[in-house]
């Protein structure tokens, strides 16, 4: 029987499991949902919150994780609900709070680097090998001027 595993999280066919994947040297993990479809198929990795102030991507990732039914899915879906957790909690726009780095620019990361480097390293080593496809959700954030879009 095929089981979807990422770090310490595990979902069997027809199951949805949520939890946290630990970041090396951090006291927290990143929130993740594993959706293991009842039927065989490929695996899609979806991430929200690489840029912590891109709220639409974060909300979309959370809604997808909550609403998708594993009994109606062929293959697997891995959802990183919020990759840059501390940046989100401290409202630092698009940077990681602890090191001031743009998480999207440090991939593939470094297990001995700053928090941003270690988050990127965890995603590259724990998530990427499981995925056939990767969708990284982005949108405008607080630094975008919406005046030209307003009637």
Report residues per predicted region.
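Structured catalytic-domain cores with a bias toward divalent-metal coordination
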Residues: 1-151
């Amino acid at each position: 029987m095929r089981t979807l595993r990422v770090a310490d999280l595990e979902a069997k066919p027809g199951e949805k499991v949520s939890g946290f994947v630990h970041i090396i040297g951090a006291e927290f993990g990143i929130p993740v949902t594993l959706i293991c479809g009842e039927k065989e198929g490929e695996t899609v990795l979806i991430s929200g919150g690489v840029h912590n102030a891109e709220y639409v991507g974060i909300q979309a990732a959370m809604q997808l994780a909550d609403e998708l039914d594993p009994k109606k899915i062929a293959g697997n879906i891995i959802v990183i609900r919020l990759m840059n957790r501390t940046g989100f909690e401290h409202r630092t726009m698009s940077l990681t709070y602890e090191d001031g780095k743009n998480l999207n620019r440090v991939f593939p990361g470094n297990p001995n680097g700053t928090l941003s480097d270690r988050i990127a390293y965890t995603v590259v080593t724990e998530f990427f090998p499981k995925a056939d496809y990767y969708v990284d959700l982005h949108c405008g954030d607080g630094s975008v001027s919406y005046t030209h879009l307003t009637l």
